[in-house]
A protein has these predicted regions:
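The feature captures two recurrent sequence modes
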Residues: 1-188
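Extended, Lys/Arg-enriched charged tracts that mediate electrostatic binding to polyanionic substrates
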Residues: 168, 172-175, 180-221
């Protein structure tokens, strides 16, 4: 069975193709990226050895994630397929509705980018450390896997508003601005003000917004 990105791509509904990126592994990640990955993962492994759920450390290996190198999406899919899941790479934040639909399909969306050395301890934008090492290992836990899938089934049916869309776009813009090394403090300030303005215009919490909060409180944290 092939786990190439092209094969996985064809299994995804066409309207979601616009959000899928291509992981050209050898061209996209350089030696510095690999060094950052090793540093972050070794620190994480040391910190979580005694505090993480036992499933997590076992799940790293079971989902194709190594401490020594950035994971290849093909290698991850070979492992995830045994758990009934797949993974694709995406370019940063994608709309919550698209994210939930992928989750309903048991497809894990993983950010393509690798954080920079300047943002080695924390990155404001989604990156492959957070998306792969942060979420994939827990899929090895059957109850968590069922929960995540069910969340997607419910989330894809949730009603959302125009305000939700505007907040998402402002949040994505801010994360992009913070991710650019050349972005000025003034540009970040403007992006933050733009997001706050959109948040202040929200007059009602939609089903989608409430589910997003629950997702942050359970899946993200």
């Amino acid at each position: 069975m092939s786990f190439s990105q092209e094969v996985i791509f064809k299994k995804i509904p066409k309207h979601l193709h616009q959000f899928i990126a291509n992981q050209d592994y050898d061209l996209y990640y350089n030696a510095r990226d690999q060094a950052v990955w090793r540093y972050v993962m070794r620190q994480l492994s040391h910190q979580l050895k005694s505090s993480a759920h036992p499933i997590y450390n076992e799940g790293l290996e079971k989902t194709g994630i190594s401490i020594e190198k950035i994971p290849s999406i093909e290698e991850m899919n070979k492992c995830l397929s045994k758990l009934g899941w797949m993974a694709i790479v995406v370019d940063g934040f994608i709309p919550p509705q698209a994210f939930m639909e992928l989750q309903e399909l048991k497809v894990l969306a993983i950010a393509l980018d690798m954080r920079s050395i300047e943002q080695i301890l924390y990155t404001p934008a989604p990156d492959i450390v957070h998306e792969s090492a942060g979420h994939a290992p827990m899929l090895y836990d059957t109850e968590y896997s069922v929960y995540l899938h069910r969340f997607g089934e419910i989330g894809v049916k949730a009603m959302f508003t125009k305000q939700d869309k505007e907040v998402y776009e402002a949040m994505r813009h801010l994360s992009i601005m913070k991710g650019y090394p050349s972005t000025t403090k003034e540009e970040i300030k403007q992006a933050e003000e733009g997001l706050n303005n959109k948040l202040n215009t929200v007059t009602i919490l939609s089903e989608s917004a409430l589910l997003t909060r629950l997702h942050w409180w359970t899946v993200e944290y």
